[in-house]
Amino acid sequence: MSFSNQNYNVHTFIIMNQSIKFWPEQERPRERLLHSGPESLSDAELLAIFLRTGSKQHSAVELARLMIQHFGGLNPVFDASLQELSHFHGIGTTKYAHLMAVKELGRRYLNHYFHQDALNLNSSRLVLDYLRYELLGEKQEVFAVLCLDSELRKLNFKKLFYGSLNACNISINHTLRYALQQHACHIVIAHNHPFGKAEPSAADLDLTHQLYQACQLVEIKLLDHFIIAKDGTFSFAERALLSQKKCMHTDIDKPDLTGEDHHKKSCDRSP
């Protein structure tokens, strides 16, 4: 390492560990946010704005960075308990209250946005954001249906089937009855993998193809099937897997909407 690099690293270390009020103005998170927008800040810098102050050992930014590294991300920081956060010097009841208030404000903002009347979900990104909001917090596998009108506005959303950590028993007939009751022109189905990867199983592929065929028979369009997991998402439509016959069963009879056609994907139905 050259002497100039050593000087740079020492300078950076001193800057990061002293109080933010002594930093050059262009390096302070709050000033950078006002000048360049919040998207220009790192997770640690955004978190530092809410922490406001650090500890005797660390600036607010360095404290925020240590917290994110310890918990493995920004979301786990906000999910941590007061007892867990208080292990960090400089974090007490006041800062914990600030973080919980920010988390609750964010939750209320999203809740208001996603539950407005006739929410327009006319892009796969909007649909995916909505489904992540609804399903990411679930601790067991859940199968859900999003019903849309002809202009891709939300009619209703329901978590139809609940299962164990990694399995869920799904009725195609029950799913179609619900979509017809909502007068849906389009539907998007989704399920989560609470502790697994966002990758489809053979049963997922089989279910998707059968439901795609069944929807065609009742003139409802299945737009996509999403798998939601903490490590990412999977779209059947993006992989051209909605109608492809890469499944165990490729032909189904016209659905009996009065029967109970269960598909193995093993659980209790939601009320």
Swiss-Prot record:
Keyword Glycoprotein in annotation: no
A Pfam short name: RadC
Short sequence motif JAMM motif: positions: 191-204
Similarity comment text for this entry: Belongs to the UPF0758 family.
Xref: NCBIfam families: PRK00024.1, radc
List of residues binding Zn(2+): 191, 193, 204
Gene3D superfamilies linked to this entry: Cytidine Deaminase, domain 2 (3.40.140.10)
PROSITE patterns to which the protein is assigned, alphabetical: MPN
Protein name according to UniProt: UPF0758 protein ACIAD3126
Residue ranges annotated for the MPN domain, each copy included: 120-242
UniProt GO BP: proteolysis
UniProt GO molecular function: metal ion binding; metallopeptidase activity
Keywords in alphabetical order: Hydrolase, Metal-binding, Metalloprotease, Protease, Zinc
